[in-house]
Amino acid sequence: MQLTELIETTVTGLGYELVDLERTGRGMVCVYIDQPAGITIDDCEKVTRQLQHVLTVENIDYERLEVSSPGLDRPLKKLADFTRFAGSEAVITLKKPLDGRKTYRGILHAPNGETIGLEFERKKGEAAMLDFTLADVDKARLIPHVDFRSRKQ
């Protein structure tokens, strides 16, 4: 079983989604998890303990394991991510330029089959729609919006 498959099986078995996995040349394994309610430190600790056990049993060589949430600017990698975050602002970088550009910033639209939509501003005040598939995407990330001025009552 490959490392990605092993980690994904473990993470999903605990009720979380594997968002991303990075392995550095220095033996560090970084695992990014999520769930609809968000991720807490306790969630990261629970997954870390289970992964440490699994990696030891499977004799996977690693120096350090980090488990964390994907953050506010989480990557979008699966079609389900684009469905979940429809209506959110995102930046999409395409593998090949379209109309002379590769990077687009706008509002995600829910996928229609395999086609994903991004409403962006072509010129000042002129909205346009970019239709693309996962195969067209090099990178996609949410754009975080944090309001430090609002207060809970």
Curated annotation (Swiss-Prot):
Q: Which PANTHER family does the entry link to?
A: RIBOSOME MATURATION FACTOR RIMP
Lineage top rank: taxon:
Bacteria
Primary residence: cytoplasm
The protein's job, in short, is: Required for maturation of 30S ribosomal subunits.
What InterPro entries does the database record attribute to this sequence?
Ribosome_maturation_RimP, RimP_C, RimP_C_sf, RimP_N, RimP_N_sf
Pfam annotation, one family: DUF150_C
Q: Which organism is this entry from?
A: Burkholderia pseudomallei (strain 1710b)
Write the protein's name.
Answer: Ribosome maturation factor RimP
Q: Which GO terms describe its cellular component?
A: cytosol
Establish whether keyword NADP is in the entry.
no
The keyword Cytoplasm is assigned to this record: yes
- Which keywords, in A-to-Z order, does the entry hold? Cytoplasm, Ribosome biogenesis
Gene Ontology biological process terms in this record: ribosomal small subunit assembly; translation
Localization recorded for this chain is: Cytoplasm
- Into which family does the record put it? Belongs to the RimP family.
